[in-house]
């Protein structure tokens, strides 16, 4: 499908009780599970012309992550990774250090700077709202830093959410909103665990997000079989650019609607969402 990379989560030791938030040392960022063959996966991906993106979920244990940071980045370089998605789900450890505290702001910057030393790109989730530092650290390509698509499976986002974010969250930098959900019936996932739950979205809305939610890193967040059901819509995801020469906000009423047109870099191709 021409995708540049695949993100693999859950590869490393520590996921058995990662939401307990009781350990000072939770994950190992250099120890894959026995059934995860790092070198074989990289070989296969390289054969297909696809990169594998690393995932570092910290379970909000930022201090433990910092202790392992250099070893984690060395592991990435030694095994052919050049991009990482970081995660900070849960209450911050050490205690009393909150996601938006000075300590954590310094941590996010420290991770970006050390990643740059190893020529590694960073996409940080559950991080503080950005303030333009992606221009200081261009390897800090994107951040989540607001309720993204994943919250559609956890009670849902307000329907006006994505008409407000371009005027609030996105003022500070690119957002990895993780759009691309084609199956809105949540009972389809997790063996029907979320029975009778429906995501507050539509197929057209999911496609529009690739234009309205600016990020030079975009994700196709659904299962492959759901994309196979809507080949024409999936073609838009494959065609839409992530790097733009021109952006025009044609009309908007925060909380009601927004229309954005962008011209793909080096072309006369316009995309409207």
Q: Predicted regions span which residues?
A:
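Long hydrophobic segments that form regular secondary structure
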Residues: 187-213, 218, 264-270
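An acidic-aromatic substrate-binding cleft motif
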Residues: 1, 5, 9
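Carbohydrate-binding surface patches
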Residues: 254-273
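Aromatic- and carboxylate-enriched substrate-binding clefts and catalytic-loop regions
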Residues: 10-198
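Acidic/polar loop patches that form or flank catalytic/metal-binding clefts of enzymes
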Residues: 7-8, 119-126, 152-154, 218-230, ...
């Amino acid at each position: 499908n021409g995708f540049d990379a695949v993100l693999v989560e859950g590869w490393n030791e520590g996921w058995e009780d990662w939401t307990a938030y009781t350990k000072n040392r939770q994950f190992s960022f250099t120890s894959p599970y026995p059934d995860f063959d790092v070198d074989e996966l990289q070989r296969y991906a390289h054969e297909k012309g696809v990169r594998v993106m690393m995932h570092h979920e910290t379970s909000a244990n930022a201090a433990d992550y910092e202790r392992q940071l250099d070893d984690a980045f060395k592991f990435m370089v030694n095994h052919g990774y050049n991009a990482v998605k970081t995660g900070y789900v849960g209450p911050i450890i050490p205690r009393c250090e909150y996601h938006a505290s000075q300590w954590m702001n310094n941590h996010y910057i420290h991770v970006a700077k050390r990643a740059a030393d190893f020529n590694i790109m960073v996409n940080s989730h559950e991080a503080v709202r950005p303030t333009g530092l992606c221009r200081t650290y261009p390897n800090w390509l994107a951040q989540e830093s607001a309720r993204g698509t994943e919250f559609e499976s956890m009670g849902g986002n307000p329907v006006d959410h994505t008409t407000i974010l371009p005027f609030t969250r996105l003022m500070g930098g690119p957002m990895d909103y993780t759009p691309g959900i084609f199956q809105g019936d949540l009972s389809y996932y997790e063996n029907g665990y979320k029975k009778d739950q429906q995501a507050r979205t539509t197929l057209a809305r999911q496609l529009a997000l690739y234009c309205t939610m600016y990020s030079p890193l975009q994700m196709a967040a659904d299962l492959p079989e759901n994309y196979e059901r809507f080949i024409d819509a999936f073609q838009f995801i494959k065609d839409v650019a992530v790097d733009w020469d021109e952006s025009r906000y044609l009309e908007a009423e925060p909380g009601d609607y927004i229309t954005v047109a962008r011209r793909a870099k080096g072309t006369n191709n316009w995309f409207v969402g």
